[in-house]
């Protein structure tokens, strides 16, 4: 098992500076250990971040007003841990994994020093025993299962147990609470262990048992610009940087609603509370398009908003990814949405300043890039010992000041992610939703997706690259038109420009308020993209730029109407037929 000190070490406060305390201690402590500081008849949770001789520096996760020199500090002997077990789904936690709905029963405001269990101890679960007496199991092996919503939640040998365990006793299948002992075992060294449905794991250590494998399954999110131009594989990593008001949070909310994954973990790290309230109001009433159930049944929310303690921002990010890794070990596909990693980086900068460390660029700590890289490296697809596969896809929103993508957090993120979805203020102001700029965005998964789709859609990769070239050429021609007007542009270039605008308006943009167009299934995307490819490869006959513009505006109107029709309905089929007839009326040849 992960070592836990049985003796309680104590100390006292020597100096306080904001939420950073210098504490003298007698005994043994280690970096990352949880400490509790006594103030006003309550105990405030803290974490050791530096050990120097017989003194430690601890960051307190609460308001430190009232702490005086000589205040008693108790060290717990264990690291900052997440409580893992059935009941995490539909849960709303703060950065220290306190259930906010339980805290709300005691007060409208978060009381200082109040901590509750993350998993309800009274809920009864229908437990099915899988292990038998005499089985030799190791960390991550299944002891039994409980039904959590539509998922079979696997109760596993704790991941903190690094020895093989011989099962000596098991409970029969039945209804039990999470604290019920469901099995007993003996390790090779002779230690007797008891297992319940709950286990703990240090949140800053990677949670992995199994073999990391290459991602080979597309994560369909229902946004054409993402699925086609900037695709992401399950187990991949991507980021969504953008300036204030560009739509980062709206994009993350869309991903949480429509991404083709089993579990979604939402980490609201330092963002406004109103955005979390919006999720809590909407999600119970929204239906998962993949299962038909409420979206909350597959969602876990870590809520550490801008009004909550800054020190807990770091723990909220690590808590979210630990919960996501836990569900990945069950062979499930998990999506972690972190909004925003910039707020986490700002918390790192604040504590680094108080530690008087040598600052890096823009006063961020010199180790910022390695911290961000270590976070994204915890994603990926994993093959378990039983042959099943799970994946953890990470999406991090980045909020660069003034939309400057050259700042340290964005640059450190871009060096480690597999896809970059850059949001543009200009596109957002022009009401082009989603405001992802395909000209600056990229994905390393494009060739992998092309290989996966090659059997279903021959030439998919080449067609996407051709569409990207049309966008680039169209943008260049558009700049020339602004300078010299349409009179100085050839008819061929005007046609390329209008085709690129048509592709942008009718394919890359979607209507978030339309029941059909807000989510576009992959089969529908393939058919619409086939239509766009047909338009790209066709040449048309026009007398003048005005006639060309009129034709493409009519075409745009009909395709927009088509996007709002129910897929494969009678109206949809008629609309598609009308569009192809309109194209034939002006077409002179196909390239």
From Swiss-Prot:
Amino-acid positions noted as binding ATP in the UniProt annotation, renumbered to this chain = 242-249
Keywords for this entry?
ATP synthesis, ATP-binding, Hydrogen ion transport, Ion transport, Nucleotide-binding, Translocase, Transport
Q: Does the keyword Chaperone apply?
A: no
Keyword check for Acetylation, yes or no.
no
The terms under GO molecular function for this entry are:
ATP binding; proton-transporting ATP synthase activity, rotational mechanism; proton-transporting ATPase activity, rotational mechanism
HAMAP family named among the record's database cross-references: ATP_synth_A_arch (MF_00309)
Identify its protein family: Belongs to the ATPase alpha/beta chains family.
Which NCBIfam families does the annotation name? PRK04192.1 (NF003220)
Name of the protein: V-type ATP synthase alpha chain
The upper taxonomy is: Bacteria, Pseudomonadati, Chlamydiota, Chlamydiia, Chlamydiales
